[in-house]
């Protein structure tokens, strides 16, 4: 199995490091190909760099580690190549105002997950994942004892199987929050199952079970 990671900023590079450390193959793509090449060289034989089109074509799963607006553009441009792929969406509807303060970029009640899922071709397999921790926490929380949880949301069986494999390979415990209608719960800035909703805490399986009791699909 190969996972394409489009975007090698804080989240993309961290996920790539965790996955290759867990034995998964990745192909990296970025607007600046030289950045993807440099990261691939750092990560070793399980990683290579390619154009966005080549990365998606070669992969079984595609993680778009980019801002929501950029993801929208990429999905429209690459829709044909995404048919049959597991598409992993770590986006959060956040940005910064003129004073540099974090702000929500979508209306209350609308999740970035619902937007992304609706843009994909019907034959794609969508899952919301790898965006429930801040980049710093994601980088340092792999392979804890007990394992830290990464929540995910999907309605798709193929995506469910794939994301369980990848989250475990990355050194975390997967825990399903629900279907796409639960995506907002695992998104910043206000999702109760995002790290922000736990007051910055990185939770384990026991805490995740308690937090989703009665609501988990």
State the predicted function of each range.
Residues 78-84, 119-121, 144:
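Short, conserved loop/helix-junction motifs that constitute active-site signature segments
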Residues 148-217:
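Active-site-lining helix/loop region of Rossmann-like oxidoreductase modules
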Residues 106-130:
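Rossmann-fold dehydrogenase core element
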Residues 101-109, 114, 140-158:
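Short beta-strand and adjoining strand-loop segment in the mid-core
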Residues 65-66, 90, 129, 153:
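Short, well-ordered coil/turn residues at beta-beta hairpins
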Residues 44-86, 92-100:
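Rossmann-like NAD(P)-binding element
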Residues 1-45:
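NAD(P)+-binding Rossmann beta1-loop-alpha1 motif at the extreme N-terminus of oxidoreductases
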């Amino acid at each position: 199995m190969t996972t394409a990671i489009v975007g090698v900023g804080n989240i993309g590079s961290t996920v790539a490091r965790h996955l290759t450390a867990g034995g998964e193959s990745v192909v990296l793509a970025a607007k600046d190909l030289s950045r993807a090449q440099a990261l691939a060289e750092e990560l070793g034989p399980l990683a290579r760099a390619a154009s966005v089109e080549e990365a998606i074509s070669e992969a079984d799963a595609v993680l778009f580690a980019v801002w929501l607006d950029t993801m929208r553009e990429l999905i429209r441009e690459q829709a044909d190549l995404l048919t049959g792929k597991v598409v992993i969406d770590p986006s959060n509807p956040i940005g910064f105002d003129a004073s540099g303060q974090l702000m929500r970029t979508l209306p209350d009640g609308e999740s970035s997950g619902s937007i992304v899922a609706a843009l994909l071709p019907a034959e794609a397999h969508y899952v919301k994942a790898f965006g429930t921790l801040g980049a710093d926490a994601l980088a340092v929380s792999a392979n804890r004892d007990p394992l830290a949880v990464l929540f995910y949301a999907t309605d798709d069986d193929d995506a469910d199987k794939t994301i369980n494999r990848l989250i475990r390979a990355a050194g975390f415990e997967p825990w399903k929050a629900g279907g796409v209608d639960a995506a907002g719960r695992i998104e910043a800035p206000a999702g109760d199952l995002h790290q922000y909703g736990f007051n910055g805490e990185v939770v384990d399986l026991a805490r995740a079970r308690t937090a989703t009791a009665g609501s988990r699909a």
